[in-house]
From Swiss-Prot:
Gene this chain is encoded by: Cwc27
Name this protein carries in UniProt: Spliceosome-associated protein CWC27 homolog
Extent of Polar residues compositional bias: 384-403
Coiled-coil positions: 206-229, 309-371
Gene Ontology biological process: protein folding
Protein's organism: Mus musculus (Mouse)
N-acetylserine found at: S2
Pfam families hit by this protein: Pro_isomerase
Length: 469
């Protein structure tokens, strides 16, 4: 990332966007893109972007906003007409967090802008880059993408800009205009479509079919009774407490017109009151019916669970029985094979070595058969053998040399206990320097006074010999 910061020019200008996803700091390149920065700053000062939505979200690509109509086709620049593109060699779409002008073609810039969510080389030399998102506010910018999007890249619950604040204005000559922001031309019906209505999925319920039938019946009755008075006889046909005979017979047509008018008003109020009562009563009946169906379905489900459980228990019993039978058959086969092998060994005429091996084998097999089975008795036997072995070791250690067992010539089970380890004595003996020995080493030092004296004497003798000659 360091090479990006080195390549990008320094910024001059800063704006703070307060959105529903959090604050977003934008630093501007007012020297590289003066027209786009002047347009953006003046629109922020004029509160042009207040309460506008981010109408387009493309995950991993861009988040677009700045249209007061919210349709993606509105928005005007401060110049009264679209202004030209401003490209710079040091500004490229090579990372996220860049702010650029949105347009429909070359030199068609208005008020709409977008944030980049990643590298977008295909936008180079097509859109004017005029700012960048700085600091930790880039994470608030990424939160703008955390919305549900339809097939047309429009968010169903879009984030919006609450207000704008210019922190540093590089253009001192900007004077905000008094303009009226265009109203949202989107019809109310289209706005309502953005929030889809929830549908009742009766298939998720165990009693879904009955609930769906009850719902259809309620809808059908409400449609048929719409616009006219309703009676409890129309809905509760199977209630024995209700009588089909009216409690008070209606007056005949010879009543006066004033009385008829008064009766109509009273009947209208009474119909409204009865309509509310009937709705509440119908809801209670449906709730009771659903509870009964739910309890019945739970019972049936419980019975159904018991049956498979009993079936699975039977299968487990059969598996255990089959396993026991297979194990018994295997043991029977092994015993038969052993008996057959014993017969063959007895029938064969073995030599001496084989006969000795068989005797040893029979001996150890007999000992193995004498051992008790696993349990407390086996444990007691093991402890007894261990204590016997300890006593043997103690006896071998405490024996005196007079009573020691002589070393056996032939190895047996107890011969190793009477064996004594003896090691070679490798201690160094002190040698006398005056004694000549085969291991004596001569040490000659020419600096030794004795050696010097010997050399002088030898030289003197050599000179005397030469003189004699």
């Amino acid at each position: 990332m360091s090479n990006i910061y080195i390549q990008e020019p320094p910024t001059n200008g800063k704006v703070l966007l307060k959105t529903t996803a959090g604050d977003i700091d934008i630093e501007l390149w007012s020297k590289e893109a003066p027209k786009a920065c002047r347009n953006f700053i003046q629109l922020c000062l004029e509160a042009y972007y207040d309460n506008t939505i981010f109408h387009r979200v493309v995950p991993g690509f861009i988040v677009q906003g700045g249209d007061p109509t919210g349709t993606g086709t509105g928005g005007e620049s401060i110049y009264g007409a679209p202004f030209k593109d401003e490209f710079h060699s040091r500004l490229r779409f090579n990372r996220r967090g860049l702010v650029a002008m949105a347009n429909a073609g070359p030199h068609d810039n208005g008020s709409q802008f977008f944030f980049t969510l990643g590298r977008a080389d295909e936008l180079n030399n097509k859109h004017t880059i005029f700012g960048k998102v700085t600091g930790d506010t880039v994470y608030n910018m990424l939160r703008l993408t955390e919305v549900d999007i339809d097939d047309e890249e429009r968010p169903r619950n879009p984030h919006r800009i609450k207000s704008c604040e210019v922190l540093f204005n590089p253009f001192d000559d900007i004077t905000p205009r008094e303009i009226k922001k265009p109203k949202n031309e989107k019809p109310e019906e289209e706005v309502k479509k953005l929030k889809p209505k929830g549908t009742k999925n009766f298939s998720l319920l165990s009693f879904g079919e009955e609930a769906e039938e009850e719902e259809e019946e309620v809808n059908r009755v409400s449609q048929s009774m719409k616009g006219r008075s309703k009676s409890s006889h129309d809905l509760l046909k199977d209630d024995p407490h209700l009588s089909s005979v009216p409690a008070v017979e209606s007056e005949k047509d010879d009543a006066t017109g004033d009385l008829e008018d008064d009766g109509e008003d009273d009947s209208a109020e009474r119909d409204e009151y009865m309509e509310d009562d009937e709705k509440n009563l119908m809801r209670e009946r449906i709730a009771k019916r659903l509870k009964k169906d739910a309890s019945a379905s739970v019972k049936s489900a419980g019975d159904g669970e018991k049956k498979p459980a009993s079936r699975s228990e039977e299968l487990r019993k059969e598996a255990r029985q089959l396993k026991r039978e297979l194990l018994a058959a295997k043991q029977k086969k092994e015993t038969a094979i052993k008996v057959e092998e014993g017969r063959e060994e007895e029938e064969a005429a073995p030599d001496g070595a084989v006969a000795e091996y068989r005797r040893e084998k029979q001996k150890y097999e007999a000992l193995r058969k004498q051992q008790p089975k696993k349990g407390t008795s086996r444990e007691d036997q093991t402890l007894a053998l261990l204590s016997q072995f300890k006593s043997k070791l103690t006896q071998a250690i405490t024996e005196t040399p007079e009573n020691s067992v002589p070393e056996a010539e032939v190895e047996d089970d107890e011969g190793w206990m009477s064996h004594v380890l003896q090691f070679e004595d490798k201690t160094r003996k002190v040698k006398d320097a005056s004694m000549q020995d085969s291991d004596t080493f001569e040490i000659y030092d020419p600096r030794n006074p004795v050696n010097k004296r010997r050399r002088e004497e030898s030289k003197k003798l050599l000179r005397e010999k030469k003189e004699r000659r």
